Amino acid sequence: MRSFAIILLAVFFYSVFHSLLASLWVKARARAWFGPETERWYRLAYNAIAVVSLVPVLALPALLPDRNLYAIPFPWALINLVIQGLAGLALVVGLWQTGLWTFLGIRQFLAPPQSASPKLVVSGLYRWVRHPLYTAGLALIWFVPVMTTNLLALFLGLSIYLLVGALFEERRLLIEFGEAYAEYQKHTPMLIPTRIPR
C-alpha cells in the first residue's frame, strides 16, 4: 500500500504543478517578467517542462514494489490492444483537428501569434464528445491488458486529473466562447459518446 500512496501523491503533485503552469495567473506573471515575447515560447516551454516532470512519475510503477492484479489472456487481450490502437489514433486525429503544431507550441515559437479570434472546433471527433482527447487518453490507460497495484494507482491518479482538468477546461471555454459553447454543451456529451451526432 505504500507504493500505491506514493504514486498517487506523485500524480497529485504533478497535477498541481502542471495546472499551476497552465493557469492564467502564471502566464500573466511570465508576461510581466519577460515581456510580450512570452507569447511565442510559453506553450513550447510549458510542454517541455510537463513532459520532463512526468518522466519520474511514470517511472515510479516500475521502481516501487508491485503486485499483479490481473492479466487478460491471449486472444482476448487483442481486443484491448485494438481499442488502445483506436484510442491512440483518436488522439492523433483530435490533436490534428485542433492544430497539432499550435498545441505543441511550435507554431507560436516560429511565427508571431495571430490576433484573430480562436475558433471553436465542433466537427470530426468533436461532434461525438466535447473532450475526445481526454476520452482517448482514458481508453488508452484503462484498456491495458495487464494490471498491477502500481499501475492502478497511476491510472486512478491520472483519471482524476483528466476529469478535473476537463471541468476546468469547460469553465474556460464557456468564458472564451460564451453562448456558442453553451449551445454545444447541450447537444454533445462531455466524455462518453452516448448519442449519434446531428
Regions of interest found by a model, annotated:
Residues S3-F17, S115-R198:
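Hydrophobic transmembrane alpha-helices
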Residues A30-I49, I72-W76, L110-S123:
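Juxtamembrane helix-capping/reentrant segments at transmembrane boundaries
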Residues S3-I7, R43, N47, A77-Q84, ...:
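Residue-level signature of transmembrane alpha-helical entry/exit and packing/kink sites
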Residues L20-E37, A62-I72, R172:
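Membrane-helix interface linkers and caps
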Residues A48-Q84, V146:
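Long, highly hydrophobic alpha-helical transmembrane signal-anchor segments
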Residues F4-Y14, R40-P56:
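Alpha-helical transmembrane segments of integral membrane proteins, especially early/N-terminal helices
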Residues Y46-A48, A77-L89, S123-G137:
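Membrane-interface loop-to-helix entry segments
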Residues A10-L24, P56, L60, Q84-R107, ...:
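Transmembrane alpha-helical segments that form the membrane-embedded catalytic/substrate-channel core
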